[in-house]
Structures are given as structure tokens and as C-alpha cells.
Amino acid sequence: SERILRMNQLPYKALHVSGKDHAGYYPGATDMTLKLLFDPNTGKIYGAQGVGKKGVDKRIDILATAIKGNLTVFDLPELEFTYAPPFGSAKDPVNMLGYAALNLIEGLSDNIQWYQLEEELASGKKFLDVRTSGEFQSGRLKVDTIHIPLNELRERLDELDKNQAYIVSCHSGLRSYIAERILKQAGFTVQNLDGAYSLYKMANPKGVEYGN
């Protein structure tokens, strides 16, 4: 756990990835969220957790075997699994954990965890939500928020301040990563809320408000 890693003063990064238990276009796909702890210097995998209705045990078994075999996060994107739409996706959530970990290691992304958000905002950073207007109206974090949908972001960069640091979020993390890349390439200082709205809502339901 993160607590044990901190107690032992081990360098680590945490990340969360959301995905489906099998191909999303095939009927019956259900959501899962996987958490990975790893050494950002060596890629060593410390541990993993998962929640979901189906298929979580399979992914944790894979990651437990990877740890036993001394695989690192650098190996995860290249792992190949049995594929058929009722049983898996062309890119499995385990592969996506690897890609997300490499983005952190290579400096393409910088994340914060849900429990760090309050402190980061108190330090002066601003919160940017890039979900659609419909998603934003349905539910949002109880924090001061700048709302710019991702498909409008490039045209509305002048509404943001390059002297201001931002924390960006979407529903599950993919769009906020894209927004993070757009903003960094434009000269902004940005971090990504790991797991985004879906994880925050699950971990801190009292921190979310619903409706108009």
C-alpha cells in the first residue's frame, strides 16, 4: 500500500486506469478501475488493486505474475492476452496501466491523487474540468472550477493564465491527459487529477454535487 511505501521511504508513483472487462462494443461490458504502485526510477511494480463487477481477478492475477517474474512497467504495454470481444479488448486495461506509467516516467504527464486535491488547490492552483457541458451539469466536484470542454480548449486558451498552475480533470482520465498535453505544449503548468471525476466520486462521495 502507499502507506507502507511511505513508511519505508521508498520512491513510488500511484496511478489509476479505468476500462472495461471486455471490448466495449460487445454487449455486457462492465467498468473496472485498476490501481498500480511502482518505482518511477526503475519501473519496479510494487503492487496493484482493482474494483469492478467482472474480470478484476484476471488482471490482478496477471500483475501478481508480473511481479513474481520481475517484470516492470516497461513490459506491461507489450504483454499479449487472449483476445475475443466477449472476453477482452485489443488493448487490455493492464496494457493501459503500462502506457500510463510510461507517460509519468517519461515526463509526458504529472499526476496528483484525489486526497491531495484540497491541499493543492489551497496552495493556489486552479481546477479545470474538460468534460462536456452535459457531464458537468450532471455532477461535479465541490471546488471552484473552470469548465472548458476538451473540444473547445484550443480555441479558448486565452481564457487561461500562463502564470497560473492548473489541475485538469475529466471523467476517467483520458481526456484530461489530452488536455494536459495541449496545455503543456502551449506553455501552461498543468497536473492531471489521477482517476479524474469517476475515482474522486468513488473515494470521496461527499465532495461531489449533482444537478444544475
Annotate each predicted stretch with a short phrase:
Residues 74-126, 133-166, 171-212:
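Rhodanese-like catalytic fold shared by cysteine-dependent sulfurtransferases
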Residues 1-46, 50-51, 89, 93-119:
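Mid-to-C-terminal Rossmann-like scaffold of FAD/NAD(P)H-dependent oxidoreductases
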Residues 53-73:
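A short, polar/charged loop-to-alpha-helix boundary motif
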Residues 3-7, 64, 134, 181:
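Surface-exposed charge patches
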Residues 41, 131-133:
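Anionic group-transfer/hydrolysis microenvironments
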Residues 50, 54, 170:
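Conserved residues at beta->alpha junctions
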Residues 15-16, 127-130:
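Short, conserved beta-strand edge motifs with alternating hydrophobic and charged residues
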